[in-house]
Amino acid sequence: MAVLQRRSSRRDLAAVAVFSGVGLVLGGCGLLPGRRREIEVAASSGLTDAVIAVGEDHEPRDVASATEEEFDWDRFAVYTIGTPATTINEESGVIVETGERYSTQEVLFVFHRDGTAVRGAPSGFEFLAHGAGAWWGPRTQLVWDPEQGTRLEDPDA
């Protein structure tokens, strides 16, 4: 279980986003050891323009910055967009195809392929954190459950 921490300095956050994005690209291309091309979970808030990547061991890996309000989804598997707490491929969802590009404003709610929704709330840039992202507060946790899939949990909510 990983705790997602909040950073306060915008300069630190910008550096983290750039370096993490580079690591995500290199890892997705197979240039870094221990990285898989297929990433299980992604979430973008639209305003934060960030993606949370979760590896095979269900631990957060990287935050990658969006460029020009678009995300290159080639690095990700197929996801469903919809409303929070609904399951994948319901009528409210929209399929995100690999290889397509979407405005971050369109990608508000992204689901784990086999589990509970992971929601990116419209928050500011200060919610980016090293290796992960925090949506509801500094104590937000990324939780893996074999029955429910990956989800975000805030003990303060």
Q: Where are these predicted regions, by residue range?
A:
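Post-signal peptide N-terminal segment of mature Sec-exported envelope proteins
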Residues: 38-57
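C-terminal partner/receptor-binding element of secreted or periplasmic proteins
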Residues: 126-157
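Mature extracytoplasmic domains of secretory-pathway proteins
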Residues: 56-122, 126
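N-terminal secretory signal peptides and thylakoid transit peptides that target proteins
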Residues: 3-20
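Bacterial signal peptide processing site
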Residues: 30-32
